[in-house]
């Protein structure tokens, strides 16, 4: 079996994912990138057939990937794609067992999410509203910080998802789970301002937030605009949508201490995902202690 034949098997798998599983083009592209990298590694190891692949060869793929500078998280993604591919080959009767089943990547160090402090959030939101797109951006910033939305949830908002009388939005989160969220008085105010101007761009588009071309704004466009506003407003740290979500979670937890409530607002399936913010909260408390407690003031 040549590299071409190896690639043909991968192409068949990708067609299966696209047609039968109906995965998104972005997900398919990610699978293709990972499996193309595996095919290149297979060429380095002299692998001629997927049937020749065993756990030792899969481990060699992992080692070679690490030597090429692939981080633990990216390696885990690559091995996950390979396991899915081998599972499919097993289902097709082309492999007896999945050789990647017992091979795992080293655990990635868990970095605490960085957040923006309250003063910087206020400075970020105090933007120059000299054009309709700036009003749109202010509304997006207010909604993102006011409800802790994921970027995909923000760009996926339609006008029909709003209830401005109650100050709530309906969002579709991960796993097609819908949740109803309060967004706060300021977010409602700026959505109303944006809706007054939105007709300048489109009238028959369902999306709440539009690009200057009158279409649903893209995630990339939101990232770009938020970063630009961070620079314009003089923030020291890079502003991206997920950092606003982190800031929402951290500030909510610091104020309320209600971990379960924050979990529901963020749409986390597992409490353990939300618990990372307790570490951020502890860091805040520890810094207060070190600055204020007499026993913490060493050498004074």
From Swiss-Prot:
Record keywords: Cell cycle, Cell division, Chromosome partition, Cytoplasm, DNA integration, DNA recombination, DNA-binding
Tyr recombinase domain span: 111-290
UniProt domain Core-binding (CB): residue ranges: 4-90
Biological-process GO terms, alphabetical: cell division; chromosome segregation; DNA recombination; DNA transposition; resolution of DNA recombination intermediates
One Pfam family, short name: Phage_int_SAM_1
Gene3D superfamilies tied to this protein: 1.10.150.130, Intergrase catalytic core
NCBIfam families recorded: PRK00283.1 (NF001399), recomb_XerC (TIGR02224)
Sequence similarity: Belongs to the 'phage' integrase family. XerC subfamily.
Protein name, per record: Tyrosine recombinase XerC
Organism of this sequence: Salmonella typhimurium (strain LT2 / SGSC1412 / ATCC 700720)
Gene name linked to the record: xerC
């Amino acid at each position: 079996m040549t590299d071409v034949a190896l690639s043909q098997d991968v192409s068949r798998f990708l067609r299966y994912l696209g047609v039968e599983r109906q995965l998104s083009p972005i997900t398919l592209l990610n699978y293709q990138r990972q499996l193309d990298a595996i095919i290149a590694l297979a060429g380095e190891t002299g692998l001629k057939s997927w049937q020749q692949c065993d756990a030792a060869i899969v481990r060699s793929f992992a080692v070679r990937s690490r030597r090429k500078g692939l981080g633990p998280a990216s390696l885990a993604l690559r091995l996950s794609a390979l396991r899915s591919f081998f599972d499919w080959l097993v289902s097709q009767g082309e492999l007896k067992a999945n050789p990647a089943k017992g091979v795992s990547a080293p655990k990635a160090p868990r970095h605490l999410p960085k957040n923006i402090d309250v003063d910087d959030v206020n400075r970020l939101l105090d933007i120059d509203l000299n054009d309709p797109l700036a009003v749109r951006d202010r509304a997006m910033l207010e909604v993102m910080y006011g409800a802790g939305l994921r970027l995909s949830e923000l760009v996926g908002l339609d006008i029909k998802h709003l209830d401005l009388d109650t100050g709530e939005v309906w969002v579709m989160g991960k796993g097609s789970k819908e949740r109803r969220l309060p967004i706060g008085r300021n977010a409602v105010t700026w959505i109303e301002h944006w809706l007054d101007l939105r007709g300048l761009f489109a009238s028959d588009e369902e999306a709440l937030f539009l690009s200057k071309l009158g279409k649903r704004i893209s995630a990339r466009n939101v990232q770009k605009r938020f970063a630009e506003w961070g620079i314009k407003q003089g923030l020291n740290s890079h502003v991206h949508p997920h950092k606003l979500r982190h800031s929402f979670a951290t500030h909510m937890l610091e104020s309320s201490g209600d971990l379960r409530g924050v979990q529901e607002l963020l749409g986390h399936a597992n409490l353990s995902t939300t618990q990372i913010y307790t570490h951020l909260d502890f860091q805040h408390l520890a810094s207060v202690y070190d600055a204020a407690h007499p026993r913490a003031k060493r050498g004074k």
